[in-house]
């Protein structure tokens, strides 16, 4: 019949002898994540078997996919594939003819970990009568000898023995059972985490302690009334002990205290040593830095050869402008009527409903040249602006977006007759209130929006120009002397690209980009006036990932060399030896090291310095290429080490947190003192009268047991 053993442990949550002594080596962990990405779980391939008695599986049609009917019934009900909780798998899933799939070792490992995650809460699940039988993924697997591959062509050269396979129905039912249990644990898990964070239950280094009875009193005083820990204190005590080796309960029957944590392996990786940060932390940080560099694509952003615009482009990001403050010669996508044109002229336009609107144009009026804009969303916010004049109050007035088309360039307009066609594409009514300052009226937040798509304008005439204006409009004529503003661009204009693959360079749409040529090619003004999808902004976004990776990996200070700054130093050392014009200055290695370090630090602080002409070192494309490639090499050749300063700083910081934690726990024990040995632990009228909720004196006693 086999042997059976029973383990029974009796604990008292509110009694003596329990231990609360968190340490870095017993950090609390559960199973916060699993590696279940499709690329890791699939494809394991599918099983194939030979058709009939074919002598060669290379013959056409010699292999076919295996189904559940190809598995002997003895294999399905074999006790080797059963947990013993049910007589056979047929009691759980229907035995129907289904195709089989091969299960990878990675999938088996992670589903097993999912089962372990549930068992952290076994006592609570039993109390709820949920998942009374522990799931076991291996029970649903059958091991067969077969050809393995995604296709028959691949499988014919890949015969394997003892291959784990499963049917889709069984796989779905297994995952559903896991999900059902996790659903039942949602509030329970939250309440457990609340209990573990209400007071410090972990310490980054060393060890701290507090009387367990004081800890229990604090939890009893502060936990929400609907906390499941109040209703199930026994089950909570066991669940916490499994997660945290610093929480230990005394076996009342045996008089012993045992560490029941099941996370010793993870806890050791999370704990720092006497001179280094935790191994897990160093691994994660290096992984993050490498991921950032990979996302930046150093080969692309340092390329001296043309790169197609869709490849170089990044997901579009909105950009904000005040059109009135941009220089026309820098923002080449803007046009302006010369200020010397002193005679305002009025025009009348319609909207899509046929309503007539009046507006004025004058010297200084600005428009967006839509011929130089990719599909774009415009949102104009006049919030906080005044626009009030002696005879012009913006409150109740309307502002609109107007699209013009004309064969005459906008900067040459002097009369309404020069305009081909125009229409109001959107408008909003303003709300404004008097400002605290005299003669000003502050406009509330507005959202005047327009989505520009070239297809809407039916651009068939290459000589036709298209412009977008934002200005006041009215159903009646606007007297030029009353409203003297040239437009309403003195506001916050947010431009958001509607397409991801188009790139512009200084206002011109391009099909390809030479990334290295962007280095040092912009002035601060032209960069500020560049469109959201400008190649310079794409470069800065990618370069920012390089800067962030350096910051994660590098703890060198100003003027200190590091593996990430010396690529610049190497380039500087060679460039000063090259034949050039003017006086040649030879700097020793100490000076070159400082120059390279300062350039790297400036880049980390503001990655846009590589684009602007003001940067003395990294505005040279050769130095930029050296940095981008050098950082990748530096990270790839790094082991699980940490910077000297980082290690010292983290350890000293951890010690300060340890001291703070112990100080907090000392306050807990002072304000929630444990009863003296000669005093009753519970049930005493004097003690219970001060408690928020009166407890059953036996509520903290639990007998846990299982039979195997």
Swiss-Prot record:
Changing residue 42 to T: Complete loss of proteolytic cleavage. Changing residue 2 to A: Complete loss of myristoylation and binding to sigma-3 protein. It comes from the Viruses. GO terms for cellular component: host cell endoplasmic reticulum; host cell mitochondrion; host cell plasma membrane; membrane; viral outer capsid. GO terms for biological process: symbiont entry into host cell via permeabilization of host membrane. The keyword Transport does not apply. A lipid is attached at residue 2 (N-myristoyl glycine). SUPFAM superfamilies: Membrane penetration protein mu1. Pfam families: Reovirus_M2 (PF05993). Glycans are attached at residues 3, 12, 81, 110, 458, 482, 528, 659. The record marks 42-43 as: Cleavage. Keywords: Apoptosis, Capsid protein, Glycoprotein, Host cell membrane, Host endoplasmic reticulum, Host membrane, Host mitochondrion, Lipoprotein, Membrane, Myristate, Outer capsid protein, Viral penetration into host cytoplasm, Viral penetration via permeabilization of host membrane, Virion, Virus entry into host cell. Cleaved during the endosomal proteolytic disassembly of the outer capsid. Mu-1 is proteolytically cleaved into mu-1N and mu-1C during the maturation step to generate the ISVP. Cleavage of mu-1 to mu-1C is dependent on myristoylation and binding to sigma-3 protein. Mu-1C is further cleaved into delta (59 kDa), and phi (13 kDa) segments during entry into the host cell cytoplasm. Mu-1 and mu-1N are N-terminally myristoylated. This acylation is essential for the membrane fusion activity. Heterohexamer of three sigma-3 and three Mu-1 proteins. Major outer capsid protein involved in host cell membrane penetration. In the endocytic compartment, outer-capsid protein sigma-3 is removed by cathepsin proteases, which exposes the viral membrane-penetration protein mu-1. Both myristoylated peptides mu-1N and phi are released during infectious subvirion particles (ISVP) formation in the endosome. They associate with host membranes and mu-1N induces permeabilization and delivery of transcriptionally active viral particles into the host cell cytoplasm. Seems to induce apoptosis in the host cell. The C-terminal region, phi, determines both targeting to intracellular membranes and induction of apoptosis. This is Outer capsid protein mu-1. The lineage of its organism: Viruses, Riboviria, Orthornavirae, Duplornaviricota, Resentoviricetes.
């Amino acid at each position: 019949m086999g042997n059976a053993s029973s383990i029974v442990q009796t604990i008292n949550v509110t009694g003596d002898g329990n231990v609360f002594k968190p340490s870095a080596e017993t950090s609390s962990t559960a199973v916060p994540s699993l590696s279940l990405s499709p690329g890791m779980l699939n494809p394991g391939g599918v099983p194939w078997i030979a058709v009939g008695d074919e002598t060669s599986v290379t013959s056409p049609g010699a292999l076919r996919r295996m189904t559940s009917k190809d598995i002997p019934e003895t294999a399905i009900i074999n006790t080797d594939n059963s947990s013993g909780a049910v007589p056979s798998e047929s009691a759980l899933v229907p035995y129907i003819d289904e195709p089989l799939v091969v299960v990878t070792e990675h999938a088996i490992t992670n589903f097993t970990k999912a089962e372990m995650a549930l068992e952290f809460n076994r006592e609570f699940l039993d109390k709820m009568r949920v998942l009374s039988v522990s799931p076991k993924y291996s029970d649903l697997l059958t091991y067969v000898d077969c050809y393995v591959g995604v296709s028959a062509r691949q499988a014919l050269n890949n015969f394997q023995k003892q291959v784990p396979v499963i049917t889709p129905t069984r796989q779905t039912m297994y995952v559903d059972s896991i999900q059902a249990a996790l659903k039942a644990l949602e509030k329970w898990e939250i309440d457990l985490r609340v209990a573990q964070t209400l007071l410090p239950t972990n310490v980054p280094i060393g060890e701290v302690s507090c009387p367990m009875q004081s800890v229990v009193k604090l939890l009893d005083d502060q936990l929400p009334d609907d906390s499941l820990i109040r209703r199930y204190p026994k089950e909570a005590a066991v669940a916490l002990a499994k997660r945290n080796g610093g929480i230990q309960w005394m076996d009342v029957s045996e008089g012993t205290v045992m560490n029941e944590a099941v996370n010793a392996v993870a806890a050791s990786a999370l704990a720092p040593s006497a001179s280094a940060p935790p191994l897990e932390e160093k691994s994660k940080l290096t992984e993050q830095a490498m991921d950032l560099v990979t996302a930046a694509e150093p080969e692309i952003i340092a390329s001296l050869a043309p790169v197609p615009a869709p490849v170089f482009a990044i997901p579009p990001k909105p950009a904000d402008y005040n059109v009135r403050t941009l220089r026309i010669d820098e923002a080449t996508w803007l046009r302006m009527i010369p200020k010397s044109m002193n005679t305002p002229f009025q025009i009348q336009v319609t909207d899509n409903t046929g309503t007539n609107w009046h507006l004025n144009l004058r010297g200084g009026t600005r428009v967006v040249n839509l011929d130089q804009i990719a599909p774009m969303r415009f949102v104009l916010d006049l919030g906080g602006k005044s626009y009030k004049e002696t005879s012009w109050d913006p409150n109740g007035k309307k502002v609109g977006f107007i699209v013009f088309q004309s064969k005459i360039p906008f900067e040459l307009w002097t009369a309404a007759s020069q305009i081909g066609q125009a229409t109001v594409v959107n408008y909003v009514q303003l709300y404004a209130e008097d400002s605290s300052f005299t003669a000003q009226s502050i406009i509330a937040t507005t959202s005047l929006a327009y989505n520009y798509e070239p297809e809407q304008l039916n651009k068939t005439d290459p000589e036709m120009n298209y412009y977008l204006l934002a200005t006041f409009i009215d159903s009646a004529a606007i007297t030029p002397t009353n409203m003297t503003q040239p437009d309403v661009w003195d506001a916050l204009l947010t431009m958001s690209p509607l397409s991801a693959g188009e790139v512009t360079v200084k206002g011109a749409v391009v099909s390809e980009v030479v990334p290295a040529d962007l280095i040092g090619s912009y002035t601060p003004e032209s960069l500020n006036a560049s469109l959201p999808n400008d190649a310079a902004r794409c470069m800065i976004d990618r370069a920012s990932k390089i800067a962030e990776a350096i910051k994660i990996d590098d703890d060198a200070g100003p003027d200190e060399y590091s593996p990430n700054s010396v690529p610049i130093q190497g380039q500087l050392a060679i460039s000063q030896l090259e034949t050039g014009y003017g006086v040649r200055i030879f700097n020793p290695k100490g000076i070159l090291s400082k120059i390279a370090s300062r350039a790297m630090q400036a880049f980390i602080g503001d990655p846009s310095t590589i684009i602007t002409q003001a940067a003395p070192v990294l505005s040279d494309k050769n130095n930029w290429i050296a940095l981008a490639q050098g950082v990748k090499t530096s990270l790839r050749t790094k082991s699980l080490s940490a910077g000297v300063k980082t290690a010292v700083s983290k350890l000293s910081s951890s010690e300060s947190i340890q001291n703070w934690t112990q100080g907090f726990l000392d306050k807990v024990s002072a304000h929630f003192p444990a009863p003296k040995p000669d005093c009753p632990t519970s049930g005493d009228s004097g003690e219970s009268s001060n408690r928020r909720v009166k407890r059953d004196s036996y509520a903290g006693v639990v007998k846990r047991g299982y039979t195997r």
